[in-house]
Regions:
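Extended beta-strand/beta-hairpin segments
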Residues: 1-71, 83-169
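Alpha-helical metal-binding/catalytic segments enriched in His/Glu/Asp
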Residues: 72-77
């Protein structure tokens, strides 16, 4: 098992001593494929295919952007919950997170201006088996998990998004 405190201790010490060293930039690049309903996504450590959802004409053989957003939230929430439980000394047998999102495709297809483009509701369901945990510990686990989950906090408090367009050759 990973000793989380010993792994994070030198990082926390460095970030306290040099706050600027805690700032990172993550990058993802989408590249054109042979079809207008798919692209490759390169995050530097992995490359994967994304497709349009079948409800807007995609083939359904790869994750759509909505799947990836929900997957990012599920991964972040699950890993954050595991890390917080470990840091709090709460033994767990299982931590599973299911994320669902509801949207109306008429918005993205331009069928109705009254229908928003994007998710209307996103729901998270945590399934935690921690037989020895007290109700107070589970309440604190929930609070800290929601507080420290980067993707959840980003969705709750959207950052400024800047776009830049360049005409290629």
């Amino acid at each position: 098992m990973v000793d989380l405190k010993s792994v994070q201790k030198p990082l926390k010490e460095r970030y306290r001593a040099d706050p600027e060293s805690s700032r990172i930039t993550l990058t993802a690049r989408g590249g054109q494929e042979g079809t207008p309903i798919a692209c490759s996504v390169d995050i530097g450590r992995a490359v994967y295919e994304a497709q349009a959802h079948t409800g807007v004409g995609g083939a359904g053989t790869a994750a759509c952007s909505g799947d990836l957003l929900l997957g990012a939230l599920a991964a972040c929430a699950q890993i954050t919950c595991q890390m917080v439980a470990t840091a709090m000394g709460i033994p767990t047998d299982r931590i599973a997170v299911e994320v669902t999102g509801d949207l109306d495709l008429r918005g993205t297809l331009g069928i109705s201006r009254e229908v928003p483009v994007g998710f209307e509701t996103i729901k998270l369901h945590f399934d935690i088996a921690a037989p020895a945990a007290t109700p107070e510990q589970l309440a604190a686990l929930r609070e800290k998990t929601e507080q420290y989950c980067v993707v959840m906090q980003t969705l709750l408090r959207p950052p400024e998004i800047k776009t830049e367009w360049a005409k290629g050759n």
